Amino acid sequence: MMSLQLGTAGKERQLAEKSRDLQNVSMTEGSEEVSEMDHISDRPDEKDKPSENLQTDSLYKMDTEKWDGLEQESEHSQDPPSKPDEQEVTLVCEGPQVSQLSPSTDESTPIPESLTHKLNYWHAKMGLQMKELGADHGDWLERINNIIQNINNTESTVKSLLTEVISLENQSKNLEDSDQEADIEEKITEIRRQLKEVNIKLTQVDACEEARELKEKLVEQIESFHKEMNVLNSKLEMYYTQGSDADSHNSEDVDTEQEEPLVPEASPSLSASPTPPCSAVWKNALKLFVIVYVVTITGLSCYILFVDATFLFERVLPSVLGHRTMWDLREMMAPFLNLEAEDLLPS
């Protein structure tokens, strides 16, 4: 199990290093692409168009291959190794000492379910984020290619218009008829209108700003992913250190148990810890009951003597026994209550 944890930790560290390298490469490539876009927008000739398209295609292929490789590595890291042969090989490579302590460590330090759930959650989250980053990166490259195509189209239209203007100027030098002059003026006005439309389109579509915004978003997502990977690595290192400490403590406990001498059977009866005194507990409970009983009786007697003498017979007993039973008791006690003092005296 320790070898599995070490393998997963090593894979996660390799993935974090690759994500860092990819971040640096993507930032440098993005800056180069933006500089190339600016350089392309300033060029007047059409000679370098195939080379630019080839550069963008090659960059796109390289980035997609890198993202696909990282996604495959993340998917492989999600699936733990299930082959028993590989586990046996790793256990044999650890040495004879580890093989001797392996049953005690496996029995004493099982992997908690919370750790496996957290690892599965982080692996799934990393895979989703890698897919999202790959999709965003591909979308960003497609948009940049579209922007470059729009710039090339505008350059071609402007160049064609310039050639038409030059041809019209050459024709205007050799003019003889007024009809040809009117046609040339109409063509010039149409060319001006087309140039105005091209300028409006260029002002509406700000290619450089859009590319920068997309690149900033991609960089932010990569940075957040890098932070989460650092957090995951720190958690994995913490769990690994806790597992190693637990293994060391368990091994020390086993050694101490083996070194302790055997105690004879008569010793537990002699050295048994004294049981808690139950008689003392019952005595305390009895004392509390007696105190409460005495306090209640004295309180009732004081209330009856000094406050209300009929409290017991007119309030407590009727509420407890009922009015019907009270009337029956009064009828039974009536002859004794109506006795006079002379009847009680001896004759």
Curated annotation (Swiss-Prot):
Annotated region (Disordered), positions in chain: 1-89, 243-274
Modified residues (Phosphoserine): S178
Low complexity composition bias: residue spans: 263-273
Keyword field: Coiled coil, Membrane, Phosphoprotein, Transmembrane, Transmembrane helix
Main localization, broad class: membrane
Keyword check for Amino-acid biosynthesis: no
Topological type in the membrane: Single-pass membrane protein
Comp. bias regions, Basic and acidic residues: 10-21, 36-51, 60-86
Residues passing through the membrane, by range: 288-308
GO annotations of cellular component type: membrane
Name listed for the protein in its UniProt record: Single-pass membrane and coiled-coil domain-containing protein 2
Taxonomy of the source species: Eukaryota, Metazoa, Chordata, Craniata, Vertebrata
